[in-house]
């Protein structure tokens, strides 16, 4: 029997194996830091200090994590249906367009708590619409979802540049961005959370969209494990043959799963667009769609695991900036190498330790 098919307890499969992958990634990263003449322990200390050493640091860490929760959930929903959605980046771009259009239309007339739910719907619809075409091509024409979603990432980026340069730009301005949203189009910061712990949020853009991300994670958990649709998606993801025998319509599930995936990716735009910059800008996604792939894989496609993995990558982003500031020898590119190692071990090599764990577990498990 293949080791991939041997069942392991959840504490091994979802806890110990990802932890081992993470430890190895950090050990190799420490070796790289040592090679360039810096102390790995000092770098690790700066990483933790930058991410959690102040209220502002925690705020930035959770701000980054918010975006990664949305995109991680987006990837996970598709994976449960047997689809590998590489297009969360592009879907987030288009979701940002929907979010910004709502904010621009309503910010002068209603308060933020009226604008926000409409912006959520707008971002979700635009993101889902961008995911629909690859989903339709996969379901009806057999086009591979990986290829089409990658192509749509580039189309989305080009479309966003065109719209910001030629349509949505403020007249007389050079910067390719919309006007700044008024107060009715800005999400409030969660400074009160930091106040509870006796610290200050500072300049960190940690905002209400974090709560929306947690609610989205709860929704995905209900959807995947407590609904008929979720059961059909998981059945299709495990075996298309079994799904066919069970009478589960392939095309319908593929399209619905991708629509949900695209909507979640689109909702990511709430965080940077309405919660941080208060305007739509080029490159506001900042690679969060691609990081979401690693977040989903490291979190084993489970909402709780995705939240924890998103916080880890938020730590790497915020703590990495702190390291590059305090240790000039460790450049931003070196931080990307460290992040890449974590992605490598969390994603591409996620089953590296599984054969050994299976062997050890079979040796010591109770009869």
Which functions belong to the PLM regions below?
Residues 18-34, 71-75, 96, 100-102, ...:
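Hydrophobic core segments of alpha-helical transmembrane domains in multi-pass membrane transport
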Residues 31-36, 42, 46, 51-106, ...:
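Single transmembrane alpha-helix segments in multi-pass membrane proteins
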Residues 5-16, 79-88, 111-113, 117-185, ...:
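Short loop segments and helix-boundary regions at transmembrane helix junctions
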Residues 194-279, 303-304:
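Helix-loop-helix "hairpin" substructures at the membrane interface of multi-pass membrane proteins
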Residues 1-24, 30, 238, 245-252, ...:
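Cytosolic-side transmembrane-helix boundaries in multi-pass membrane proteins
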């Amino acid at each position: 029997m293949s080791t991939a098919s041997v069942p392991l307890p959840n504490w091994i499969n979802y806890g110990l194996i990802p932890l081992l992958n993470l430890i190895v990634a950090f050990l190799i990263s420490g070796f790289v830091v040592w090679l360039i003449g810096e102390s790995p322990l000092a770098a690790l200390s700066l990483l933790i200090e930058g991410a959690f050493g102040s209220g502002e640091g925690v705020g930035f860490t959770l701000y980054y994590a918010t975006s990664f929760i949305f995109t991680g959930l987006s990837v996970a929903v598709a994976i449960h249906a047997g689809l590998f959605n590489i297009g969360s980046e592009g879907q987030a771009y288009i979701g940002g367009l929907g979010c910004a259009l709502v904010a621009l239309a309503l910010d002068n007339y209603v308060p933020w708590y009226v604008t926000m739910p409409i912006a959520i719907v707008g971002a979700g619809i635009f993101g889902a619409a961008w995911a629909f075409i690859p989903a339709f091509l996969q379901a009806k024409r057999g086009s591979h979802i990986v290829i089409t979603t990658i192509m749509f990432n580039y189309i989305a980026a080009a479309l966003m540049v065109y719209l910001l340069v030629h349509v949505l730009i403020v007249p007389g301005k050079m910067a390719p961005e919309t006007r700044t949203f008024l107060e009715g189009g800005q999400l409030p910061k969660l400074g009160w959370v930091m106040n509870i712990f006796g610290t200050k949020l500072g300049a960190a853009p940690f905002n209400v969209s974090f709560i929306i991300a947690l609610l989205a994670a709860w929704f995905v958990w209900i959807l995947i494990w407590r609904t008929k649709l979720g059961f059909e998606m998981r059945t299709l993801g495990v075996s298309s043959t079994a799904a066919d025998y069970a009478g589960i319509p392939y095309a319908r599930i593929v399209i619905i799963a991708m629509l949900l995936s695209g909507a979640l990716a689109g909702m990511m735009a709430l965080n940077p667009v309405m919660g941080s910059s208060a305007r739509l800008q080029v490159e506001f996604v900042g690679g969060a769609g691609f990081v979401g792939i690693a977040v989903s894989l490291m979190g084993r496609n489970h909402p709780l695991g995705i939240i924890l993995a998103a916080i880890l990558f938020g730590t790497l982003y915020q703590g990495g900036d702190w390291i590059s500031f305090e240790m000039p020898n460790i450049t931003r590119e070196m931080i990307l190498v460290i992040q890449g190692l974590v992605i490598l071990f969390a994603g591409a090599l996620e089953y590296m330790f599984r054969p050994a764990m299976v062997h050890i577990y079979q040796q010591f498990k109770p009869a």
